[in-house]
Amino acid sequence: MTSRQSLIVAMLTAVIALAPAPSFSHSLLVRSQPGQRSTVTRPPERVQMWFSERLEPAYASASVWNEAGKRVDAGDASVDQNDPTLLSVSTPNLGPGRYTVRFRVLSVDGHVVESSYIFTVRAPAR
């Protein structure tokens, strides 16, 4: 192999090694209010969830369920227009108890993520 061919091979190897790799990440839940596995003494008016990527509003859903398996949210889950990583749903009149938040989102990379987490509302101390 000539020195010119060796130089070309070395340059091509460097270009391939330094090229950015495609991203294969999915939209991950990075923060929520109430937090995952948290206990609060004041019932939230809304459950809010922030994700690692922008969400597709038409394919995002969230629901809140009580211990008896009854849906207790207002059915108004939506992606925030000013923050496309924020999905929230109203939770009127939550009493003390354990709640499960279920969500399903489609991120702009085309991947569906479906999961759930719990939080607890505890009666305030008297």
Model-derived features: where do they sit?
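Extracytoplasmic/periplasmic copper-protein system
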Residues: 26-30, 110-126
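Short, surface-exposed alpha-helix to beta-strand junction/turn motifs within ectodomains of secreted
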Residues: 48, 53-75
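N-terminal edge beta-strand
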Residues: 24-43
